[in-house]
Amino acid sequence: DLDPAVITGQTALATSPADTDEFLISDAGVLKRLDASLIGGGAHVLLATTNVTSGVSQVDFTSGIDSTYKNYMISFTDVHPATDSVQLQMRISISSTFKTDTSYIYGGIGRESDAGVISFSDSTGSGFKLNHNLGNASNESSSGNVILHNPSGTTFSKMFQADATGISAGGRGNKTIVGGFYNSTSAVDGVRFYMSSGNIDLGTFKLYGIN
């Protein structure tokens, strides 16, 4: 008989299992061991986290975006601006230099809770706009996700898409969807988030690789 302590475990594993760690499985009633490397992970692999707890001018991810994954996602949660009626924006980095030229091309649509239509676009932007007119009242913030498509590729322009929800200046709820590209085929190696005016006061930003 197998000692139950072998199954229940004597010591907790405090970190992710190594590829050579093993599990016991029942294969048609026969116990077999299985390497952790053969067990598929989740679709999203957390690579980095930045928690903003006081005012900063920007949040940068300058490592972790490379050819390891085809696509990357950045989630932002409870992002609160210092200034009223501003937008969260994003720039990309090429060869460790954040681009501030007018090669950001995008369009977005959305709705506000008063049935107002949101529409914005730019063919000569200096950054991607990710949401709509955030309020800075104590209960107002924005959350959403940005997808970078094949940032390490060098054949096509650098595509992105984003969706966000938030509370506008004036207390209206809103939802926006935006997509576009940076007009260069060079590999992207970083991203920067910043407000159209003023600081980011609070928020959590997470970078994921997408399997």
What function would you assign to each model-found segment?
Residues 3-11, 19-31, 35-211:
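Surface-exposed molecular-recognition determinants
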